[in-house]
């Protein structure tokens, strides 16, 4: 009966965090609008080989993540939940692997359930796992690869070892098809310390080639298909998206070596109090094979991405699966022997919630700021934000009431965030970061437009997805579409600022021309170097400018 209650509680937890509130949040640009539109175009065109964005070749990532996203929109429709369904599914599958792996290591159902709940409630996992990017997919394949390798190395027969390594190769191949060759580097780096300390080189060298073969066979069909369709794909993807992105001096998203320290700290909420003890206990028990494996799984990718010049928080998502298992194991030990860390965790959550309440007041219309984040007419959003932090502090306090028994309720600290964050976003943020909000405000003007031009790729993708059209023209800036715009068949999909007046004269009689520009909040739109318009509709950071036929 207790197991049934636990399962019901887990399903309710998943529903409240990962299912019910997802549709209430508008898509963010540039990431979510980009991936939503790529998948929409894949469904509309039926081309499941070459990814396109706004009808242009888009070679920043391989194809597998777009497949999953497209299936999500196919099943649930072109809506907010449909766009995010794929990443939610991947996150829940990763949580299932955490459950399975914890059970395999410790044979403890309660520990497995706690590890799963901790993983799903970690701030970084929840933030990325409900956000339509490709990182939850690659995290799933990396976690599946680590589970497969352990399965292979623990097998007692050659059939079991062979099956494990073949499965490892498939997961690595799918990882390559999701986000590239890092799906090969990260698992190798993660297992090497364990292989070295356990002296398991023989099995690795005897059976490792099976993983190589299955990885190649997994990638080969699509790899050959896209090479035939687009011969330049692999050169661009390998050199620009791997070497330049991570290693060269002009790498994207450059950050210092210590970049991931605050990411780990913030990402570990609401379980931050367990982080030091989990790592220390893991190190102290390093003679235990499973503990070494989890430590290596956590630390090696972190070091690898810290050394790389290009960094983003999403890169280390897979590390939190092993970290959740270490935290759950340590938490049960602490609850049994010395609950000091659990008390500290409760106070950290109280402090975080109270700090959030104070910060919300400071940036509210009733605070001391001259330009508050929320305006007076958005008072309900302020109360939503207060509720988010109040619930965080409340559950932090509740875990202290009988800490040996109530500490797991820290998983409910982000409940207010999950349910209310979509209702608390300030209008000034929505107007710049949520193209759907802009489209809703200007739908009647946008719909009949013959041509739509914009100076932001993220906004362009949002307009294309909302209006179900991929012919949005880039104005003045190419952004990440620079490569696709270089192809001869992309002629006419970009108009520079200097050419706009002539372009307008040539196309004005064909129908309404709409220009959507991103501007600074205090920028005077009358100073823009554009021909006089027939209509202007400013929505704070986005401006709709229209030219009608004459």
Curated annotation (Swiss-Prot):
Residues that span the membrane, as ranges: 7-27, 81-101, 111-133, 137-154, 165-185, 204-224, 255-275, 288-308, 315-335, 346-366, 382-402, 406-426
Pathway: Lipopolysaccharide metabolism; 4-amino-4-deoxy-beta-L-arabinose-lipid A biosynthesis
Protein keywords: Cell inner membrane, Cell membrane, Glycosyltransferase, Lipid A biosynthesis, Lipid biosynthesis, Lipid metabolism, Lipopolysaccharide biosynthesis, Membrane, Transferase, Transmembrane, Transmembrane helix
Subcellular location: Cell inner membrane
Domain of life of the native organism: Bacteria
Membrane disposition: Multi-pass membrane protein
Keyword Iron-sulfur included in the entry's annotation: no
Molecular function (Gene Ontology), one example: 4-amino-4-deoxy-L-arabinose transferase activity
UniProt-listed Enzyme Commission number(s): 2.4.2.43
Reactions the enzyme catalyzes: 4-amino-4-deoxy-alpha-L-arabinopyranosyl di-trans,octa-cis-undecaprenyl phosphate + lipid IVA = lipid IIA + di-trans,octa-cis-undecaprenyl phosphate
InterPro entries (alphabetical): ArnT_tfrase (IPR022839), Glyco_trans_39/83 (IPR003342), LipidA_mod_glycosyltrf_83 (IPR050297)
GO cellular component, one term: plasma membrane
Signal peptide, first to last residue: none
Coiled-coil annotated residue ranges, if any: none
Matching Pfam families: PMT
GO biological process, one term: response to iron(III) ion
NCBIfam families, A to Z: PRK13279.1
Record's function text: Catalyzes the transfer of the L-Ara4N moiety of the glycolipid undecaprenyl phosphate-alpha-L-Ara4N to lipid A. The modified arabinose is attached to lipid A and is required for resistance to polymyxin and cationic antimicrobial peptides.
Family from the record: Belongs to the glycosyltransferase 83 family.
PANTHER family referenced in this protein's UniProt entry, alphabetically: MANNOSYLTRANSFERASE YKCB-RELATED, UNDECAPRENYL PHOSPHATE-ALPHA-4-AMINO-4-DEOXY-L-ARABINOSE ARABINOSYL TRANSFERASE
Name of this chain's protein: Undecaprenyl phosphate-alpha-4-amino-4-deoxy-L-arabinose arabinosyl transferase
Organism whose genome encodes this protein: Escherichia coli O9:H4 (strain HS)
Taxonomy of the source species: Bacteria, Pseudomonadati, Pseudomonadota, Gammaproteobacteria, Enterobacterales
